Regions:
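Non-heme di-metal
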Residues: 1-228
Length: 228
């Protein structure tokens, strides 16, 4: 969990660097408060975490439907720029963020399933209904956010309905990974190019940059060998 937190700190620094590079003012950080849809997203998440729900439901809400869902509509819309050869540096940030958030989601869902396995009395119809309700609400909030984002006009190579279907596809994947059934019935990835961009190997000029792909090989051996 500390590793997850460290990655989140890197995400904050990365997006702050992006905003500064684009010359956007500091007020940008609070401008989301001017949009009812974004305020509703923030308040719903805050209320879900701070209310009296069981820790298992909070884990599901945080991992599956916040890190694992609510961020992804923004990720997809931003990743569409480097897909068309624009803002490639930002595309790297988004790609790494998706990889990290997916790892966080999978990690906490594994923790959720272990917790449920050790507390079987909690896994009942009431708990399942609460999780399904959260999933449906989060998807509804993302629909509103996507509509807001597309109000400015058409986006090259991307339609709002495609993003909405992708969110439903992701939501079902999260539910299934928690041992539940998918309720949005989107079995095929509507945006296959997303997977292609995320999974593509990082190629970089050795003298200008360095690759940042995760590598299993780096986890083998001993600490003595690392510093040899």
């Amino acid at each position: 969990l500390m590793g997850f937190a460290a990655r989140e700190a890197l995400h904050i620094a990365s997006y702050a660097h992006l905003i500064e590079t684009l010359g956007m003012p500091d007020t940008t950080y609070s401008e989301f408060k001017e949009y009812e849809v974004m305020v509703e997203k923030h308040e719903y998440f805050t209320n879900t975490v701070n209310n009296g729900l069981d820790i298992s439901i909070k884990m599901a809400a945080l991992s599956a439907f916040t890190e694992g869902l609510a961020l992804f509509s923004s990720f997809i819309m931003l990743l569409n720029f480097p897909r068309h050869g624009k803002m490639k540096g930002m595309g790297q940030i988004i790609t790494w963020s998706i990889v990290d958030e997916t790892m966080h989601t999978e990690g906490v869902i594994k923790l959720f399933r272990t917790y449920i396995e050790e507390n079987r009395h909690l896994w009942n119809d009431k708990t399942k209904k609460q999780i399904y309700d959260i999933a449906e609400k989060m998807v509804d909030l993302e629909d509103k956010f996507i509509d807001l984002a597309f109000q400015m006009g058409k986006v090259e190579g991307l339609r709002s309905e495609e993003v909405k279907q992708y969110i439903r596809y992701i939501a079902d994947r999260r539910l299934i990974s928690m041992g539940m059934r998918g309720i949005f019935k989107v079995k095929k990835n509507p945006l296959p190019w997303v997977e292609e961009m995320i999974n593509a190997p990082t190629h970089t000029n050795f003298f200008e940059n360095r690759a940042t792909d995760y590598a299993k090989g780096a986890l083998k051996g001993s600490w003595d060998e690392v510093w040899a």
